[in-house]
């Protein structure tokens, strides 16, 4: 086990999440506080710990893919980094631009990218199963995003 690669992988993914949270934090207390939300909206305090755990798991998968040479499969590399980019972009669209419709389009693409990432990494390793909690969370977030769009359109 290469501890340096593991730490670098986890920190890289956490850094992307932290960068996205910059757009989120500014809007949670202002714009998002006034948005009509569905009954199944979790409390705001839950999002930080949930995302931290998920980014940690994503970082472990990044490490496993990197350490075991899965990057030689261009599909793994493309879908993995696409889903990270879409994840970051969602915070900008939904919170930064305060645009639930743009966020919805992005998160649907994110759902697809994560599913493909799981499938492509699974061909190499069952470590892709570490992404299942992430997929579950973003599918829930997709439903939440859709409901917020409908309630505020």
UniProtKB/Swiss-Prot annotation:
Location of the protein in the cell: Cell membrane
Domain of life per record: Archaea
Keyword hit for Transmembrane: yes
CDD domains per the UniProt record, alphabetical: TSPO_MBR
Annotated keywords: Cell membrane, Membrane, Receptor, Transmembrane, Transmembrane helix, Transport
Membrane-crossing residue ranges in chain numbering: 3-23, 45-65, 78-98, 101-121, 129-149
Membrane-topology annotation of the record: Multi-pass membrane protein
GO CC annotations on file: membrane; plasma membrane
Gene Ontology molecular functions: tetrapyrrole binding
Record has Transmembrane helix as a keyword: yes
Principal place of residence: membrane
Gene Ontology biological process terms from the UniProt entry: tetrapyrrole metabolic process
PANTHER family: PERIPHERAL-TYPE BENZODIAZEPINE RECEPTOR, TRANSLOCATOR PROTEIN
Described purpose of this protein according to its UniProt entry: Binds tetrapyrroles and promotes the photooxidative degradation of protoporphyrin IX. May play a role in the transmembrane transport of tetrapyrroles and similar compounds.
Family per similarity comment: Belongs to the TspO/BZRP family.
The protein, known as: Tryptophan-rich protein TspO
Source organism: Archaeoglobus fulgidus (strain ATCC 49558 / DSM 4304 / JCM 9628 / NBRC 100126 / VC-16)
Gene name linked to the record: tspO
């Amino acid at each position: 086990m290469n501890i340096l690669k593991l730490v670098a992988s986890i920190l890289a993914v956490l850094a992307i999440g932290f960068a996205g949270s910059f757009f989120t934090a500014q809007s949670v207390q202002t714009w998002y506080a006034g948005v009509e939300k569905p009954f199944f909206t979790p409390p705001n305090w839950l999002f930080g710990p949930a995302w931290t755990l998920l980014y940690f798991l994503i970082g472990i998968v990044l490490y496993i893919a990197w350490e075991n040479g899965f990057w030689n499969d261009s599909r793994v590399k493309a879908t993995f980094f696409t889903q990270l980019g879409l994840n970051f972009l969602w915070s900008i669209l939904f919170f930064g631009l305060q645009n639930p419709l743009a966020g919805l389009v992005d998160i649907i693409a994110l759902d697809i990218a994560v599913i493909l990432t799981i499938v492509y990494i699974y061909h190499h390793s069952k470590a892709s199963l570490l992404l299942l909690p992430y997929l579950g969370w973003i599918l829930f977030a997709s439903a939440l995003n859709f409901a917020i769009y409908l309630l505020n359109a």
